[in-house]
Regions:
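Short beta-strand to alpha-helix junction loop
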Residues: 56-62, 89-112
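A conserved short coil-to-beta-strand element within the FAD-binding core of flavoproteins
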Residues: 121-136
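N-terminal FAD cofactor-binding segment of flavoenzymes
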Residues: 19, 40-84
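Short hydrophobic core segments
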Residues: 5-7, 29, 125, 145-159
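Glycine-centered tight beta-turn/hairpin loop motif at sheet-sheet or coil-to-beta transitions
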Residues: 139-142
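Central helical "cap/lid" subdomain
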Residues: 36, 45, 147-196
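Glycine-rich FAD pyrophosphate-binding loop
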Residues: 5-7, 18-45
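N-terminal Rossmann-fold NAD(P) dinucleotide-binding loop
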Residues: 13-14
Length: 212
């Protein structure tokens, strides 16, 4: 039996897994086909891909800046070059906040942190049960695994469904609405304009980005 089961392979889950793996045994599970979570990337060809999750990362805290600086040194991420146009007058770009993207897609951070860790994709957790301080984790394919400890980094609706009976904190009963976004991924002929993103003044079309 391993020490930890971590559900979710986004930046949070990957960071926790990377840190714990130095001392403990663990497995990471994700219902998606690959690592990334909110920073998912869809590969189109060997050299082309779409970051259809988070568009970029803008580190603000001292700790996060240090974390990103280390990834910049290792060439896992890079600064997002080009102009960023804010056509919405209610929104203004903060020039102090640098924009960081993955060198090979925004899921590069998770993939780097998880490179030596046992990851299980296409693995959806449907139920958790605690018996004598041992966690029984059930999956959609009918299989079950036992772990000493369990860490959930999945989206709140899934977290609430799985863990409500075990979490006593008041936040678990909050009604949190998650708004869906529709992402259109397009390949167009290269243009000479040095513009990396548009923030539109439109109720429906909010953002257009060109990075990976």
């Amino acid at each position: 039996m391993k020490d930890f089961c971590i559900i979710g392979s986004g930046i949070s889950g990957a960071t926790i897994a990377n840190s714990l793996s130095k001392k403990y045994s663990l497995d990471v599970y994700d219902k998606a086909r690959g690592a990334g979570g909110r920073s998912s990337n869809k590969k189109l060809s060997k050299n082309e891909s779409f970051d259809h999750g988070v568009q970029y990362i803008s580190p603000k805290s001292t700790q996060f800046k240090k974390f990103i600086k280390n990834l910049l040194t290792k060439k896992i991420v890079k600064k997002w070059p080009g102009k960023h146009l804010f056509l919405n007058t209610d929104k203004k770009e903060d020039k102090k906040h640098i924009k960081i993207i993955g060198k090979k897609g925004n899921n590069a951070i998770s993939k780097h942190l998880l490179k030596d860790i046992d990851c299980n994709f296409n693995s959806e957790v449907v139920k958790i049960f605690n018996n004598n301080k041992i966690w029984e984790v059930s999956f959609s394919d009918g299989s079950k695994k036992l772990y000493k400890s369990l860490i959930l980094t999945c989206p709140f609706p899934q977290l609430k469904k799985l863990s409500k009976r075990y979490i006593k904190h008041s936040f678990i009963n909050k009604k949190i609405k998650m708004d869906a976004n529709i992402t259109v991924m397009m390949v167009i002929k290269k243009r000479k304009l040095n513009i990396s993103s548009y923030f539109f003044n439109d109720k429906i079309l909010g953002w257009a980005g060109n990075e990976n």
